Amino acid sequence: MPLQKNQVLTLTIERLSNDGSGVAHSPDGEAVFVPGTAPGDEADIRIVKDCGRYAFGILDTLRTPSPDRIPVDCAVAGPCGGCSLRHLDYAAELRAKQENVVDAFRRIGGLDVPVLDALPSPEVDRYRNKVQFPVGRDKNGAPCIGFYAGRTHRIVPCPDCKLQPGILNDIGNALCSFFGAHGIQPYDEASGKGLVRHIFLRRGAHSGQIMVCIVCTRAKLPRSAELVEQLTAQFPDIATVLVNVNPRNTNVILGTETHTLCGPGFIEDTLCGVPVRLGPLSFYQVNTLAAEQLYGIAAEYAQLQPDDLLLDLYCGMGTIGLSMVDRCRSLIGVEIVPEAIDSAKANAARMGESVAARSRFFCADAGKAASQLAAEGLHPDVIVLDPPRKGCDEATLSAVVAMSPRRVVYVSCNPSTAARDAKWLETQGYRTEKVQPVDLFPRTKHVEAVLLLTKLNVERHIEVDVSMDELNVTAAESKATYNEIRDYVWDHHQLKVSNLYIAQVKQKYGIIEREN
């Protein structure tokens, strides 16, 4: 029987979905997704939408709180939509993230692979090195920083975001006070009037340097010299102040024109010892300390040897590959964003002549570049993949297989697409050895993962005797199917074999390939 809008059910939350919502089931077995709940909560849930096979609800009354529920320490955690898990104990959050990675690999990848416990972030709060505050007005009409409420462009004032270092919140508030004191108006989307759209701040986790970028609808910022003088006197760690111009009616934060009011126009920092320069357009991991943990796992999985060639696809600013360059003979990086490739080359140069000489970076689509490199006969020993959320396309994965690396290290920001891609690679002679979830975004639904895939080698894997009698094959002309072989090996040896591996064994022993 369909659930009705505003119907109230008493349900127990069983787990968290991959978007951070609690999952319960109605008496008829229909899944109900409820944000702001914790596994173990017993609550009255009000249905807001029934989609047939599943429904969405909201928390009406919490009857019995979960042992994993904690007090929310931010007044706008719900409305702002940023910290979807702020009500959950951090240990429970890590368990939920690990379980979601396991679920993705089983449900989407069809893979029962070892998924390790999620690696916690060194900092649970105040961990972000970048913030983009939309500028609006508070209830008194004064300029304020905040965040957009979920699925809207309504700004929720937030003077102290718990995910940002306190100094970045302080700078945002100081700028808004200056704007209010001097009549500098926030931009209003509805009317198209006003000047200041966003305050974009970066802070080097190791250097402490701060970049201030004020996004405006036009280049001229009133009293800019006075603003710079006051701001740098109050916050001496500010290394540069910029104005970015974005006059368009768009959701995109930054425009294409940037003017430097003071400093070099960038800040400097390091990531796993790689020196980086960061401007407004730089793509950079927002949790430096956790990213260094992730890169350490990637290097451990790569197991590079001194004579190895490392190929870093989707290399960005080159930081993953450059963090491993001292362990291998040479590095090739590929990235489609020209500014990122320029940064990668500059980062390599700052690491010294030896690193620069052994590192090459190319601006190209990862799939096309990988296909060309494979066609040219390139055979890297290890390939690192760090694709966007959509994962890799089949052309890229096919090129990876053609280049035949002994190891593939896959860094993922979306376990679902990582599981899909791992499933495809397993059909082509690679085995997913293990998956390490890494929490780069505490208090939010997001989780990263590092996968290790190794190339199967018919000469190095154990031999398994398969009896035709055990497979119930009686006719002399019959052959065991691939599925029968896979099932037999799993039932008797708890080993997984791919179609390519079976074909390699058949070819080695002269077994003719037919319909099986």
Task: Pin down the residues of each PLM region.
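Short Lys/Arg-enriched helix C-cap and helix-to-coil transition segments
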Residues: 513-516
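DNA-recognition alpha helix
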Residues: 481-493, 503-509
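Flexible loop/N-cap segments at domain edges
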Residues: 199
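Terminal RNA-binding accessory module
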Residues: 1-72, 76, 361, 367-368
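Structural signature of eukaryotic scaffold interfaces centered on beta-propeller domains
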Residues: 202-204
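Short, acidic/hydrophobic/Gly-rich beta-strand patch recurrent on exposed beta strands
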Residues: 22-27, 146-149, 213-215, 344
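Rossmann-like S-adenosyl-L-methionine
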Residues: 2-7, 18, 219-474, 482-483
